[in-house]
C-alpha cells in the first residue's frame, strides 16, 4: 500500500515544532500550532496587550 501525499486542504500544513495539523497560525509564515505559538510568542517578539 502506497502512502498518498495530501496536496490541498486543511491537513497539508503542519506545525514546525510539534507536527500538529489543527489550530495552525499561518500569518507571517509562522506555521506553528496555537499551543506552540503561545509558548514561544514572547521570545519571537510578540507582546500581549490585554
Curated annotation (Swiss-Prot):
Keyword hit for ATP-binding: no
Domain of life: Archaea
NCBIfam families, per database record: PRK05766.1
A single GO cellular-component term on record: cytosolic small ribosomal subunit
GO biological process: cytoplasmic translation
Binding note for cofactor: Binds 1 zinc ion per subunit.
Role, per record: Binds 16S rRNA, required for the assembly of 30S particles.
Oligomer and partners: Part of the 30S ribosomal subunit.
Record-stated family: Belongs to the universal ribosomal protein uS14 family. Zinc-binding uS14 subfamily.
Keyword entries, A-Z: Metal-binding, Ribonucleoprotein, Ribosomal protein, RNA-binding, rRNA-binding, Zinc
The keyword Metal-binding is assigned to this record: yes
Name of the protein in its database record: Small ribosomal subunit protein uS14
UniProt: Zn(2+) binding residues: 15, 18, 33, 36
An MF annotation (GO) of this entry: rRNA binding
Cofactor: Zn(2+)
Amino acid at each position: 500500500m502506497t502512502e498518498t501525499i495530501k496536496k490541498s486542504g486543511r491537513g497539508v500544513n503542519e506545525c514546525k515544532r510539534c507536527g500538529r495539523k489543527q489550530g495552525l497560525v499561518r500569518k507571517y509564515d509562522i506555521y506553528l500550532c496555537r499551543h506552540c505559538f503561545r509558548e514561544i510568542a514572547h521570545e519571537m517578539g510578540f507582546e500581549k496587550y490585554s
